[in-house]
Amino acid sequence: MLIDYLNHQLREREAQGLTRQRRIAESPCAPRQRVSQRGQPARDLLAFCSNDYLGLANHPALVRALAEGAQLYGAGSGASHLISGHSEAHAALEADLAAWLAPCIPNAQALYFCTGYMANLALLTALGGANATIFADKLNHASLVDGALLAKATLQRYAHKSLAVLARQLAACDTPIKLIVTDAVFSMDGDVADLPELLALAERFDAWLVVDDAHGFGVLGEEGRGSLSHFGLCSERLICMGTLGKAAGVGGAFVAAHPSIIDWLVQTARPYIYTTAAPPAVAHALRESLRLIGGTEGDQRRKQLQQLISQLRSQLAELIAAQPALGWHLADSSTAIQPLIVGSNEAALALAAALDAQGLWVPAIRPPTVPAGTARLRITLSASHSADDVRQLVDALAQAGKDLAGAQP
């Protein structure tokens, strides 16, 4: 019965153009990767799909640091953090992260997690008890959505970036604990939350602002300190989750917050307590990553990334203006996430396939990840891309647009 049901559902997904496929990368994360899929021969593709925003995932210094960490601490941690798996590498990384966020969160402490998904589940389920209300942007990342649903708190969602709706919800709320929860940079649209106004609402209504800075950490703000720094925010009411497998180039995540919040997570957050700690070697490598992000090389990489973003937006705007019949729309984003919205699932899949045929890897994103009718190519840029890479992408999109238009009846 189960297998019959699942096979029926899988066929339904395939008919709707919603089937997901995994590809196998046979080389390190980089703009050019060797990739295979479903037994097909491997090919070299120009990729615009990773979250390696600063191009650090294969940086020689991080590769060396990871190997050094393995020599120092072995391959694995062997236990959860609260048994025997919490190493000096984890503790040192948490101290570094706390210092990193201290200009924005006074007296901050930090807690390291294996993944961003686990960090968000831990944070919202631990703080979102029956005496709390969670106010969540409707376009928040799936991990924030799931964390809010699993929490015992009352959940209220507000239309994307609608501060007026949020203010009314807060004004009507009488629970003692109020958590405003938002992405800083929204993962599928690339736009940035109005964090200063959200913090003002938190202060006005005695709430706390939980910020998922997965796509801002390392890229935005002074020395890449993230979205809180980008806006010049400083408040004990801020709780920041950041991921360390995107701009930081390695893996894991952290929560930085008031010391009492961090202690509460250690005591009660089930996704932290009941899982084996990440390998200490990863934490060791991440300390080197922070040094790179906050140094001169980090500044240079952020400058390169911003130049590529400006180039791509300018050249895509020209392309869209020249071929209006395609119905493409470039989302309003100033970040490394540049969504090209094409509409239907079929159109997005066809465009991704046309680019693949030209040797470019740009994934089609479809519902339920994005709202129905807004299927898109999620173009992501890295500081490791070149201006020629961006030009090649735009030229390939122009050719694909012509080919697809000519193929229509």
Swiss-Prot record:
The modification N6-(pyridoxal phosphate)lysine is found at residue 246. Keywords: Biotin biosynthesis, Pyridoxal phosphate, Transferase. Its EC number is 2.3.1.47. The keyword Transferase applies. Its cofactor is pyridoxal 5'-phosphate. The keyword Ligase does not apply. Pathway: Cofactor biosynthesis; biotin biosynthesis. It catalyses: 6-carboxyhexanoyl-[ACP] + L-alanine + H(+) = (8S)-8-amino-7-oxononanoate + holo-[ACP] + CO2. It comes from the Bacteria. Substrate binds at residues 20, 141, 369. One of its GO terms (biological process) is biotin biosynthetic process. Pyridoxal 5'-phosphate binds at residues 116-117, 187, 215, 243. InterPro entries: Aminotransferase_I/II_large, AON_synthase_class-II, AONS_Archaea/Proteobacteria, AONS_Proteobacteria, PyrdxlP-dep_Trfase, PyrdxlP-dep_Trfase_major, PyrdxlP-dep_Trfase_small. GO terms for molecular function: 8-amino-7-oxononanoate synthase activity; pyridoxal phosphate binding. It is an enzyme of class 2 (transferase). Belongs to the class-II pyridoxal-phosphate-dependent aminotransferase family. BioF subfamily. Catalyzes the decarboxylative condensation of pimeloyl-[acyl-carrier protein] and L-alanine to produce 8-amino-7-oxononanoate (AON), [acyl-carrier protein], and carbon dioxide. Homodimer. This is 8-amino-7-oxononanoate synthase. It comes from Polaromonas naphthalenivorans (strain CJ2).
